[in-house]
């Protein structure tokens, strides 16, 4: 006689690890309802509510509310690595809203759906960081991607923004298809969606051709989301076409979430195949370093320069992944966390120097900035020096960490490529510093920015790159704790 299987009842305690995500998604739905009753004149309340929701989620993560564990049969995993990534993701998402408020309001671009989309995109990134199955990876990825497409297209009257959103959507859909196809091959070969189950199935199997093919397709999808060459075609157009606050958001937190996706898929799921995919990741790293730096040199538009420099930074991040092991992943996370802070500050400077009717997005717009605004020039100097990897700024220690991980992972050739490209990359960052301090101003001096909140946030953000560079060890220890015991 057949018996019907029964499922254990799901209790409130079982959902405890999911508390930050539940609060965030609940806040997003509440904001969606609130926006219906708030006039355009009073949109500041939707802005403040969205920032408050992210602040509450940040506190929940920082205090460890809900505890660690896995739920839904391992589909959702909350561990130290997930908490580190989520904390930074939520912090940077909140900063993007703070940076963007005045900019979007002055240009009549601020609509209630923008903070709603940011909250849902943040929820998608948090799901990626905690994914324990292929299904959760795809759910988090699509939630992030669909919100990102809409955010890029938020300036409907701008042809560049519309074109960028269309390219982003088409190429993003293609990348999602590649990723999904790779997942289907892996599922067909292992018979499970669980990443831990896939790991065990691979260890007990001698037939790996189908698994390697699936891994290649998944790596292509991950590379697109990261912006690694040669899957970076969407980056320059999106960074240039999107409003600066949207470009800030897309350039920062999603990179950390994509790193989390790479870790879950490749190390947790496809770990037994690491000797094969480490070489592929190393190749992507080298190509990204070379292409990103060479293309960035030729740019006169600062947003496009930052887009190509992102490609090179992703190359350094992948260097840590290619190194593998506890040290490699800790170095890669250290780089990802630090880069999100640096990228936020770089686009924050563009926002702070822009005015309604004028976008400070060309390098020539920074000419003579020291003569007009020495404080702002000093902040931009800190940002560019950190991105270039000049000591004692934070960017120097991040590059040193991933280079060390590559050497320890027997990838000396990749470390040498990284050193050469780091020297090349310093050129275009130093060019921005040069025009600020040694070139004559172009045009009339810009009016002073009276937004004290924006100025304060940018000041703290930029000076943090110096402060954290002088005291980088706690961040590195934080990242090492996330991967303690990883072989």
Curated annotation (Swiss-Prot):
Q: How does it sit in the membrane?
A: Multi-pass membrane protein
Q: Where in the cell is it found?
A: Cell inner membrane
What sections of the protein cross the membrane?
18-38, 44-64, 84-104, 116-136, 169-189, 211-231, 242-262, 277-297, 305-325, 333-353, 377-397, 410-430, 457-477
**Gene Ontology BP, a term:** ATP synthesis coupled electron transport
Sorted keywords for this record are:
Cell inner membrane, Cell membrane, Membrane, NAD, Quinone, Translocase, Transmembrane, Transmembrane helix, Transport, Ubiquinone
Chief location of this protein?
membrane
UniProt subunit comment: NDH-1 is composed of 14 different subunits. Subunits NuoA, H, J, K, L, M, N constitute the membrane sector of the complex.
Q: Which organism is it from?
A: Xanthomonas euvesicatoria pv. vesicatoria (strain 85-10) (Xanthomonas campestris pv. vesicatoria)
Q: Which reaction does it catalyse?
A: a quinone + NADH + 5 H(+)(in) = a quinol + NAD(+) + 4 H(+)(out)
| PANTHER family xref list | NADH DEHYDROGENASE (PTHR22773)
Name the source's superkingdom: Bacteria
Q: What does this protein do?
A: NDH-1 shuttles electrons from NADH, via FMN and iron-sulfur (Fe-S) centers, to quinones in the respiratory chain. The immediate electron acceptor for the enzyme in this species is believed to be ubiquinone. Couples the redox reaction to proton translocation (for every two electrons transferred, four hydrogen ions are translocated across the cytoplasmic membrane), and thus conserves the redox energy in a proton gradient.
UniProt GO cellular component terms? plasma membrane
| Record-level Gene Ontology MF annotations | NADH dehydrogenase (ubiquinone) activity; NADH:ubiquinone reductase (non-electrogenic) activity; quinone binding
| Family, per entry | Belongs to the complex I subunit 2 family.
Which EC numbers characterise this protein's activity in its record? 7.1.1.-
Gene that encodes the chain: nuoN
Q: What is this protein called?
A: NADH-quinone oxidoreductase subunit N
């Amino acid at each position: 006689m057949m018996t019907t299987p029964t499922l254990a009842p799901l209790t409130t305690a079982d959902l405890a690890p999911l508390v930050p995500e539940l609060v965030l998604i609940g806040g997003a739905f509440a904001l969606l309802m609130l926006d219906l009753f708030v006039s355009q004149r009073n949109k500041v309340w939707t802005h403040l509510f969205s920032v408050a929701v992210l602040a509450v989620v940040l506190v929940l993560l920082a205090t460890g509310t809900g505890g660690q564990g896995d739920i839904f049969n391992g589909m959702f995993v909350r561990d130290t690595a997930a908490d580190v990534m989520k904390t930074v993701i939520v912090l940077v998402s909140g900063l993007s809203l703070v940076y963007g408020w005045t900019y979007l309001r002055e240009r009549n671009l601020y609509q209630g759906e923008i903070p709603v989309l940011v909250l849902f995109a943040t929820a998608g990134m948090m799901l990626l960081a905690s994914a324990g199955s292929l299904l959760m990876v795809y759910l988090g990825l699509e939630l992030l991607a669909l919100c990102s497409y809409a955010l890029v297209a938020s300036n409907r009257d701008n042809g560049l923004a519309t074109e960028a959103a269309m390219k982003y959507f088409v190429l993003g859909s293609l990348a999602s298809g590649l990723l999904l196809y790779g997942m289907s091959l892996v599922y067909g070969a292992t018979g499970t969606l669980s990443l831990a189950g896939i790991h065990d199935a691979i260890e007990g199997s001698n037939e790996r051709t189908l698994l390697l093919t699936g891994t290649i397709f998944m790596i292509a999808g991950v590379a697109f989301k990261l912006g690694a060459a040669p899957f970076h075609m969407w980056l320059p157009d999106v960074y240039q076409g999107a409003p600066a606050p949207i470009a800030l958001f897309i350039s920062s937190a999603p990179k950390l979430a994509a790193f989390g996706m790479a870790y879950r898929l490749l190390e947790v799921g496809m770990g037994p195949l690491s000797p094969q995919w480490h070489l592929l990741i190393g190749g992507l790293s080298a190509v990204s370093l070379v292409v990103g730096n060479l293309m960035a040199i030729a740019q006169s538009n600062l947003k496009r320069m930052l887009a190509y420099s992102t490609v090179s930074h992703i190359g350094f991040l992948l260097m840590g992944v290619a190194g593998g092991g506890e040290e490699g992943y800790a170095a890669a996370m250290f780089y990802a966390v630090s880069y999100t802070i640096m990228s936020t500050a770089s686009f924050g400077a563009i926002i702070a120097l822009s005015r309604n009717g004028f976008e400070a997005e060309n390098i020539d717009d920074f000419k003579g900035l020291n003569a007009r605004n020495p404080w702002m020039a000093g902040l931009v100097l800190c940002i560019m020096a950190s991105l270039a990897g000049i000591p004692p700024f934070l960017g120097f220690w991040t590059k040193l960490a991933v280079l060390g991980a590559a050497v320890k992972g027997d990838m000396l050739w990749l470390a040498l490529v990284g050193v050469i490209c780091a020297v090349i990359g310093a050129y275009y960052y130093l060019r921005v510093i040069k025009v600020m301090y040694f070139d004559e101003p172009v045009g009339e001096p810009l009016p002073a920015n009276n937004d004290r909140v924006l100025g304060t946030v940018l000041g703290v953000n930029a000076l943090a790159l110096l402060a954290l560079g002088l005291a980088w060890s706690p961040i590195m220890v934080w990242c090492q704790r996330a991967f303690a015991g990883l072989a």
